[in-house]
Regions:
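Radical SAM enzyme core and accessory elements
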Residues: 102-160
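C-terminal accessory region of radical SAM enzymes
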Residues: 16-40, 62, 68-121
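Histidine/acidic residue-rich metal-binding segments in metalloenzymes
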Residues: 12
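Short, small/polar residue-rich loop motifs at catalytic or cofactor-binding pockets
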Residues: 49-52
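Short, structured coil/loop segments at alpha-helix boundaries
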Residues: 8-9, 21, 127, 137
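Short, acidic, Ser/Thr-enriched surface-loop or helix-capping motifs
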Residues: 57-58
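Conserved strand-turn element in the central/C-terminal portion of the radical SAM core barrel
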Residues: 1-9
Length: 160
């Protein structure tokens, strides 16, 4: 569930109860600020994003930066014209991964405005993994951007 400013605590409780009833793990997250269009108090993390090691392909074949790039504005290539492996290892994809791994996420568009907080530790040296691990832990402790189904809801939550 994506929580917005007008999401009521009762709505979240009903969602949690609905998921528990069906024995499904759930997560409630805040709305991420991908292109700077969403009002959010969460800052852009300093560590690398999990999306830099994924491949997201739109229905038209465009390989995008991440799942948030639904129109392919930050595309890496076209899977209908070249292999996915070539695109993944291509210069644009490598440049994004390098910037993230160097701790320069905030300097590359659109990542510089995106506050998605899940990290990627792939391809990092051990010192950088430790550094980003501490940064991630601090981010979670300071901002607590998600609520797991076991947190802060009474067992007698109302049913949907």
């Amino acid at each position: 569930m994506t929580r917005t400013d007008d999401t009521a605590a009762a709505d979240q409780a009903r969602f949690v109860a609905y998921c528990k009833q069906r024995k499904v793990n759930c997560m409630i997250v805040g709305l991420f600020n991908y292109l700077g269009d969403v009002k959010s108090s969460l800052p852009v993390p300093s560590y690398s994003c999990e999306h830099i090691t994924r491949v997201d392909i739109l229905s038209n074949g465009l390989v995008t930066l991440c799942c948030m790039d639904t129109e392919g504005k930050f595309g890496w290539g076209d899977a209908s014209k070249e292999s996915i492996l070539d695109i993944y290892n291509g210069p644009r994809a490598r440049a994004y991964r390098a910037m993230h791994r160097q701790g320069r996420r905030k300097q590359i568009p659109p990542c510089g405005t995106c506050n998605l907080f899940w990290p990627s530790f792939d391809g990092l040296s051990w010192p950088r993994r430790v550094q980003f691990g501490f940064a991630y832990a601090y981010y979670l402790l300071r901002y607590r951007p998600f609520i797991k189904h076991t947190a802060s809801f009474p067992a007698s939550s109302p049913s949907p």
